[in-house]
């Protein structure tokens, strides 16, 4: 381990790849936000993990995330591999399908079934976020 120009520790994985305290903190914050979000969504719907048919991971996050590693640090619940689905850029794919098919009534039907849930101002989210900062596997409910 060495120190950077600010005196912060730098852990070298190779001569060109290294990990800093800022990297670990960014991981902790992302992990806490995702885990808290999943917990709040489940609680909001009154669901347990066993009731889920699947967990869909989208965008660059979903494409490159290793679900086993994410579960090991508590970012995601431990689920059977068959219940974890990486769907790529779902928003772009959906928009492209809509543009090609021109079926606005189907899109309206989906929109009418959606519920927007703002997490940032919720006290239960703040509590779950703080609880999920440590990098450890969680006992998901």
Please name every model-derived segment.
Residues 1-141:
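Helical "lid/coupling" subdomains associated with nucleotide-phosphate turnover
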């Amino acid at each position: 381990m060495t120190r950077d120009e600010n005196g912060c520790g730098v852990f070298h994985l190779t001569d060109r790849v290294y990990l800093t305290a800022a990297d670990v903190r960014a991981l902790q914050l992302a992990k806490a936000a995702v885990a808290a979000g999943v917990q709040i969504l489940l609680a909001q719907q009154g669901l347990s993990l066993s009731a889920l048919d699947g967990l869909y991971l989208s965008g660059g996050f979903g494409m490159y995330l290793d679900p086993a590693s994410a579960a090991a640090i508590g970012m995601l619940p431990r689920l059977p591999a068959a219940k974890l689905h990486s769907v790529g850029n779902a928003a772009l794919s959906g928009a492209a399908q809509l543009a090609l098919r021109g079926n606005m009534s189907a899109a309206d039907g989906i929109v009418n079934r959606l519920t927007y849930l703002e997490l940032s101002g919720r006290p239960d989210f703040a509590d779950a976020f703080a609880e999920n900062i440590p990098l450890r596997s969680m006992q998901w409910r």
